[in-house]
Amino acid sequence: MPPKTLFPLVPACDAAPRKKRLAVALLAVPGLVPAVSQAQLSGAAAEPQAFGSPWDLRLAPQLDEHPQKQGGKPATFVLADHTNGTAEQDLAAKGAAEIRRGNAAVKADAIHYDQDTDMADAYGKVTVANGGTTFSGPEAHLKVEANQGFMTTPKYRFTATGGTGSAERVQLLDSERSVFTNGTYTGCQCSTNPAWYIKGSEFDFDTGADEGVARNGVLFFQGVPLFGSPWLTFPLSGDRRSGFLPPTFSPFSSTNGFELSLPYYFNIAPNRDLTITPHIISKRGIFTQATFRYLSTNYSGTLTGEYLPDDRVAHRNRYAIFWQHQQNFGNGFGGYVYYNKVSDNLYPEELGSTNQFVNGVQTVYQQEAGLTYNNGPWSVLGRYQHWQTLPPSAAPYGREPQLNVKYTKYNVGGFDFGAEADYSRFRITTADQPEGDRVMFNPYVSYGLYGPGYFFVPKAQLHMASYDLTTTTGGVPGQPKRFTYSIPTLSLDTGLVFDRSVRLFGQDFIQTLEPRLFYVYTPYRNQSNAPLFDTAVSDFGLAEIFTPNTFVGNDRIADANRLTAALTTRFINPTTGDERARFVIAQQYYFTDQRVTLLPTEAPATARHSDLILGASVKLGAGFASETAFQYNVDNNQLVKSSVGFGYSPGERRVINVGYRYTRQNPTLSNEPINQILMSAQWPLTRRLYAVGRLNYDLASSRVVDGLVGFQYDADCWAFGVGVQRYANGLNSSGQQNSSTRVLAQLVLKGLTSIDNGLVTAFRAGVQGYTPLPPAPAPLSRFSNYD
């Protein structure tokens, strides 16, 4: 076989002698590849780095691309087994023929090329490549540099986005735009029998704009038509594009009947978008939702509006507004807005979003705007806070307005000191509840002594509060409306740290032994006249026993003369410093009775010591971890509260969680007893099929509080999931918990769209450690299939 012939052609205006044309063409090679819109190194970073010897090869940090100079014309190269023709006019090439000009390449069994018109006619196993797009078919007729022409029965691939397909004919408009007649498109990498594809009478593709348009398009999945439209637009890379999103359909319900929604997405700008979703609710009418999202360097937010005119069931207009905004004014100043409002009490139950199934039906809506300032030791908050409360929830107090100032300074000659000042005007929508103003000032100072094996921190603080009430509880005669409290608190926090090297289960550890004492003294002050604006009883656990006040909020300061004793031991990996296990035991000892109570009708506590608190956390190999906590009443020999949890996660999408929660009923606190088992998991059944589930079972009532079971299947270019969820749905007329069931589903056509009515959201909320299925792999680089 004769060797292939390299036959360079140069533009006719070039007067270089014939024997110099090869050299001229070779010198033009660096200009063949056009510039691309990607980040390029510059300066010294882009220079090749030499090895030690001057004769060594050099490492280039990037693929260097040289754009064609403006006004310059790239050389044309022809490669074939046999060539003949007239120089500077035309050329016939046969046998593995190739023509290259700029970044365009044409390959075929035979090519006829006319240099004057730059027209190439290719026959037999034709491949046309330009700008990362490849077409193949039996014949093609096009201008090489302009990439203008047509091709019959082509197959195509967009290398940059991964899209493929075929058609009866393609009209090439330029290097980015093309029109296909009676064709198909898919994002699947397989060239035959793709799982999903779009079939249309005509396709308009624009790789520069990342957009495809199908006329009379029908979306097929596994050979079954899912959706059809006379005008169907879609992104070629899966990025955001304006257009219709997949419709969603909800099965019949007694509340709303059938529901059908068809969202339209407006990609306004890279940092702004708008989604308008009309819902057809068979029993109520047309319900419209609009969500506007915006993001900038100094602000971001989401605004959602919902409107149902003339509800055919409720016989009134119904609406909802949800607005979240964050603002950075610079120099430490900021601001925010949270405004949420619904038209009526039944709105969240009848027209609420799918998030209510995860978090329960929302009955309290925050309406708040504030300004903030943070700079060094200073922190300032000014806000106006109001609440819309729906029955049966109890309305919280709003701060209308509030000004809070904090100052904190650390290690000034060994001292830590600071103060918090707060003014709040409390208002509430519930009748016969006290309202008024409260001014609070809380300075403190502490001095810490720290060493390698000890710490000793005395602290003094003062709580001052002044009230000016406009109304009192029930309007009791003689109850004061103006009064002031001043309550000091002294505390001492000290502890030691011992450590030793031990060997357990064949492994070396550093074991610590950490005794800790925390003493608090606060004198008694009668605070029964103060309303409960923001105060409640603090929980009793390892996180709360080292705080001076047994209440949270500023309306009650507990009198105290108590000592908290705790002992902690840790087992630490000496090489990595990772804590593998921790065990804690703690108890409080009361030297006097605590007389301050949350409500005046409550009896003071007279116990000499608290319940015993025990906690443990263990991390073993292969992803196993455990967290346990117990509250035990030694006097009554009763378990008051317990929480036991185990987690096992040996790898990605492999997690099993088992937990148990128990809380004994306490008549003095009117708490609900808890005796529940919780289990959740995500685990692969096969290489592609995953099971996901959650169960919260109440042992006392022998019922499922909430449950979720589902499956997810991950294929190469699509994914499918289905689940059934049982969830709490408020209380019935007898005061018992209602439960409802719903079916969840998800279909992901990778590279095109996703349809999901809440499946992934439910999996995330229900299974700790849940990992979603992976997205479609990134498309290959345009250099991967270089022709």
Curated annotation (Swiss-Prot):
Subcellular location: Cell outer membrane
Organism of origin: Burkholderia mallei (strain ATCC 23344)
Xref: PANTHER family: LPS-ASSEMBLY PROTEIN (PTHR30189), LPS-ASSEMBLY PROTEIN LPTD (PTHR30189:SF1)
UniProt entry keywords in alphabetical sequence: Cell outer membrane, Membrane, Signal
Main location: membrane
Record-level GO cellular component terms: cell outer membrane; transporter complex
The name this protein goes by in its record: LPS-assembly protein LptD
Subunit structure, interactors included: Component of the lipopolysaccharide transport and assembly complex. Interacts with LptE and LptA.
Family: Belongs to the LptD family.
InterPro entries in UniProt: LipoPS_assembly_LptD, LptD, LptD_C
Signal in keyword set: yes
Pfam families hit by this protein: LptD
Highest taxon listed in the record's lineage: Bacteria
GO terms under biological process: Gram-negative-bacterium-type cell outer membrane assembly; lipopolysaccharide transport
HAMAP family per record: LPS_assembly_LptD (MF_01411)
Signal sequence bounds: 1-39
Function: Together with LptE, is involved in the assembly of lipopolysaccharide (LPS) at the surface of the outer membrane.
Keyword presence, Metal-binding: no
